[in-house]
Structures are given as C-alpha cells and as structure tokens.
Amino acid sequence: MLSSQTSSIFTVSRLNQTVRLLLEQEMGQVWISGEISNFTQPASGHWYFTLKDDTAQVRCAMFRNSNRRVTFRPQHGQQVLVRANITLYEPRGDYQIIAESMQPAGEGLLQQKYEQLKAKLHAEGLFDQQHKQPLPSPAHCVGVITSKTGAALHDILHVLKRRDPSLPVIIYPTAVQGDDAPGQIVRAIELANARGECDVLIVGRGGGSLEDLWSFNDERVARAIFASRIPVVSAVGHETDVTIADFVADLRAPTPSAAAEIVSRNQQELLRQIQSAQQRLGMAMDYYLANRSRRFTQIFHRLQQQHPQLRLARQQTALERLRQRMGFALEARIKQANQRQQRVSQRLSQQNPQPRIHRAQSRIQQLEYRLTENIRSRLSEQRERFGNAVTHLEAVSPLATLARGYTVSTTTDGKVLKKIKQVKAGDIMTTRLEDGWLESEVKSVTPGT
C-alpha cells in the first residue's frame, strides 16, 4: 500500500516550494486592507509588520526599494491599503505577503492629502487675512456657483427671495462632485470674473462625506478663489465641514443659507429705516421751528426795550432774512426728504410693498401740509405781534406826545419839572418843544388852588 503512494510523498522542502509556486501563480497581485501592528524597520531598511482585521492576521514584508516610494510613515493601528504578492517563506513554511505599494485606507488618504495641501497653501500665504477682500455693502448683484439641481441652490434662492426680492442673482451652474467638478468650478469662477456682472460670489454645495466635498479641497479650486477679483463667500456643507476653499475664501459661511443671509439685506429692516427717517425728519422740523420761535421772541423783547425807529427797521430786515432762510431751509429739508423717499421707493418698487409705501407717502404729504400751514400760521401771528408792538411803542413815545402840542420842562441839572415847588423866582429852566428847545427865567411862582 505504501509503495503505491510513494510518488505522492513530498519532502518538506518540496512541499513548501510547491505551495509557494501555487500561491504566486494562482493569486498574483492583490489589494489587501487591514490594520498595521508589530511594525519594525531593521538596519537593512526593509519594513516588517502584521496586517490584521477583527478575526485574522497575516505577516507582511516591504523591501526598501518599494517602501522608498511610500509618502507617509506607517503607524501602529493605522488602516492601510496594500498592493502585494502572496508567497511562502520556504525555510520556515511561513505564509506571508510581499507589499509593493501602500497608502492610507479610505478617508485616511484623503485626510492626509487635505493636511498636506492645507500646510502648503498656508505656507504660501493664501490664508493670510491681508488678502481677504471686504464684501460689498450692500450687494447689487450676487453670483452663485453650485449645482443647478442641488439643495444648496434652492436654499440660497429661498433666503434671497425672502430677504431681498429685488436683488439680482446670476447662477453659474457647475458640477460639485466627481472628477470633472474641480475644473468646472474653476471655469465658473473665471467666467464670473471675466463677465463682471456681480459684486460678490457664493461658492459651495450641500453637505456630504469627505469624498463628496473633495472638489472643494482641490488645489485648482483654492487658487481660483484666491485669484478672484470678486469677493468670494464659501458655503460648503454644514457648519462642521471645513474645506480648503473655506480657508482661501474672503469669508466662510457655515451653510449655503447662511451665505445668502450674509450677502443680502433685510427688506423689513429697510422699511424700519424709512420709518425712522420719517420720525427724525419730524423731530428735526419741530426743533427747528421751536428754535426759530425762541429766537423771534428774544428779538421781540429786545425791540420792546430799544424803541428807536432805525433799530426797529434793522431788526425787521434781519427778521425778514431769518424768515427767508427758514423758508429756504425748510424747502431744502422737504426736498431732501422727498428725494430720499423717491430713492427708497425706487429700490422697493420691485419688492411690491405698495400698501406700506402708499401709507408712508400719505403720511409724508400730511406732514408736509401740516408743516407748511404751521409755518404760515406762525409767520402771520409773528407779523401781527410785531405790528402791534410797533403801534404800541409809537403810541407811548415821548416824541408822539410832543407832536400833540405838549412840552417838557427841565431844570438846569436835567430833572423833569412835575411840581411848582421844584422852582423859584429867578431859576433858569429848559423847555422841549416838538421842533426844538427854549430857555427861560422864572419871574414868579404861583401855586395852583
């Protein structure tokens, strides 16, 4: 029985050799993913380690001529992807793999590329604050570079329509995922700059995995954003997603919706500004009128205390100039208010808040009418008061009394003679008539009965 099986008997050496040949010929090169453990590098420069998963492990070797091409230093516990040949180490009969190339597995590779590019661009100064352009305030036209079918575009347009319906939006559609996406994004940025239609750009997309967002970690995209003459707001993924584009952009928004909030103005805020401007205008008019009224009162009191006709004429001239200046100032203010209201109305014309605008315009017209009537009434009242004051002062003027035939006599020391006992025979007195003075001597004094 033994003799019939003699041809099938293997020596240990032959067995190991046969198994090695079978493994190398049948398996060829394969890709293997696993976790590194027991990593060593002796003086020869070769790498020896174990690849394992939850239930199994295999010994690996990577010779110096191969590991020289690996761009990272393998670490214990690191997940890697290895391209290798399956073989058997004949002297010990150990099954092992000979690695030809190695790279971090899955997102580990992408994360490593991300960190390398981030460090490179940071060293070149592309992230420096001194290169950041300020955003226009307000924006007159917004450019959006994203997928025309993505949720990000819908969110951006929804926010812009709600906040600032009249703000023009230009969409530069592009792929945001896949091999062609970086090139398309770069061309869209360059096109927007060449056309010069908008003064701010939103570049972004909705959320996703690191692989989904990878187009915004592309060096070409980063350099295109940096070179853009139009300020760029990056809006990639969710708040926790940070891409290279975020570092290079002039401003990073946590989401596409937030980017739309940043570049737009609130329509309700514009209406509040109009109402505030109306209130300030009314207060300014009231203050101006009150100030002029006080000034007029002061002038009136001074005129009462200083009767001479020439000064009255000068004050009347000054008052007329003040009235004219006040009229010009009020007309200028009303004109400015009308111009401001017209500008605001033009900006809001496309937003169609017509009921509020009509009410605001009616209110302004009422204020203008009331203001004009108030000014006219005040001026008429002040003219009447001024005329009455002049008439009163003329009525009590000593000159008017003299004109009616009366005289005023004074002693030599200037005292007005009111009683007979102030003089005696022989005293000299001066008498004021309407057209001059006369000097006389008292001959006798006769008291009245």
Curated annotation (Swiss-Prot):
<comment type="similarity">
    <text>Belongs to the XseA family.</text>
</comment>
<keyword id="KW-0269">Exonuclease</keyword>
<dbReference type="Pfam" id="PF13742">
    <property type="entry name" value="tRNA_anti_2"/>
</dbReference>
<dbReference type="GO" id="GO:0003676">
    <property type="term" value="F:nucleic acid binding"/>
</dbReference>
<keyword id="KW-0540">Nuclease</keyword>
<dbReference type="InterPro" id="IPR020579">
    <property type="entry name" value="Exonuc_VII_lsu_C"/>
</dbReference>
<protein>
    <recommendedName>
        <fullName>Exodeoxyribonuclease 7 large subunit</fullName>
        <ecNumber>3.1.11.6</ecNumber>
    </recommendedName>
</protein>
<dbReference type="Pfam" id="PF02601">
    <property type="entry name" value="Exonuc_VII_L"/>
</dbReference>
<keyword id="KW-0963">Cytoplasm</keyword>
<dbReference type="InterPro" id="IPR003753">
    <property type="entry name" value="Exonuc_VII_L"/>
</dbReference>
<keyword id="KW-0378">Hydrolase</keyword>
<dbReference type="InterPro" id="IPR025824">
    <property type="entry name" value="OB-fold_nuc-bd_dom"/>
</dbReference>
<dbReference type="GO" id="GO:0005737">
    <property type="term" value="C:cytoplasm"/>
</dbReference>
<comment type="subunit">
    <text>Heterooligomer composed of large and small subunits.</text>
</comment>
<dbReference type="GO" id="GO:0008855">
    <property type="term" value="F:exodeoxyribonuclease VII activity"/>
</dbReference>
<dbReference type="GO" id="GO:0006308">
    <property type="term" value="P:DNA catabolic process"/>
</dbReference>
<dbReference type="GO" id="GO:0009318">
    <property type="term" value="C:exodeoxyribonuclease VII complex"/>
</dbReference>
<comment type="function">
    <text>Bidirectionally degrades single-stranded DNA into large acid-insoluble oligonucleotides, which are then degraded further into small acid-soluble oligonucleotides.</text>
</comment>
